[in-house]
């Protein structure tokens, strides 16, 4: 087990112990894809990496999202065409191979999205490979200046009493942490070299080492869908 210091906490206790059996690795060399099938990931970071998220589709004048790596190469895309906040969204690579399918679910009053990792390029292969579930902790009125949190259930943490990760918004930034408060990724508005912030639809994402950035993008998309941004 490992002990991490929780940086943004005002409670009296300072440390929290994370039992290994309740945690899901963001991505080990060999990992389980929902149904216990082992598969290697080509999306694991070896060091801190930066990405640019453009909340626009490559298809002209349609809804979606495009993700670039630090060299300007397109690595992920989402094309919703004329639909916004639809019930099912596909995260694809540049070639159009489906990596994750995100589906909206109805659980009480809270908005919930589930992510299904594909074992191949076909949409049908995602039917039973549930990978994560994202929902807001409480009913929240969207406000760009407020703070809100979202719990992420994944792997062995499938019930609502446990969560493996959480997303916290602070103003216009989004932080993704494990359940011990260790930062895994952060998304904020992109700035130019001169320090000027670009448009609201251009974001920069920093992903820490040993993190599956395809999984992180899936969580960012779920957050955008919950808040009707995508």
UniProtKB/Swiss-Prot annotation:
InterPro entries: LOR, LOR_sf, Tubby-like_C. It comes from the Eukaryota. Pfam families: LOR. Might be related to the phospholipid scramblase and tubby-like superfamily of membrane tethered transcription factors. This is Protein LURP-one-related 11. Belongs to the LOR family. Coiled coil: none annotated. The lineage of its organism: Eukaryota, Viridiplantae, Streptophyta, Embryophyta, Tracheophyta.
């Amino acid at each position: 087990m490992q002990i991490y210091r929780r940086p943004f906490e005002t409670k009296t206790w300072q440390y929290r112990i994370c039992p290994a059996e309740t945690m899901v690795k963001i991505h080990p060399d060999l990992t389980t894809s929902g149904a216990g099938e082992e598969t290697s990931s080509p999306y694991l970071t070896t060091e801190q990496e930066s990405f640019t998220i453009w909340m626009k589709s490559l298809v002209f004048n349609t809804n979606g999202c495009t993700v670039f790596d630090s060299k300007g190469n397109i690595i992920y895309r989402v094309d919703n065409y004329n639909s916004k906040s639809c019930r099912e969204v596909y995260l694809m690579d540049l070639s159009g191979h489906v990596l994750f399918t995100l589906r909206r679910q109805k659980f009480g009053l809270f908005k919930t999205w589930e992510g299904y990792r594909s074992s191949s390029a076909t949409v049908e292969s995602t039917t039973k490979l549930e990978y994560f579930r994202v929902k807001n902790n409480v009913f929240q009125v969207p406000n760009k200046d407020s703070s809100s949190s979202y719990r992420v259930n994944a792997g062995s943490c499938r019930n609502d009493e446990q969560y493996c990760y959480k997303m916290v918004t602070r103003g216009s930034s989004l932080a993704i942490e494990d359940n011990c408060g260790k930062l895994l990724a952060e998304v904020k508005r992109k700035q130019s070299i001169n320090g000027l912030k670009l448009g609201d639809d251009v974001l920069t994402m920093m992903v820490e080492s040993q993190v599956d950035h395809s999984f992180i993008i899936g969580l960012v998309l779920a957050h955008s869908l919950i808040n009707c941004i995508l």
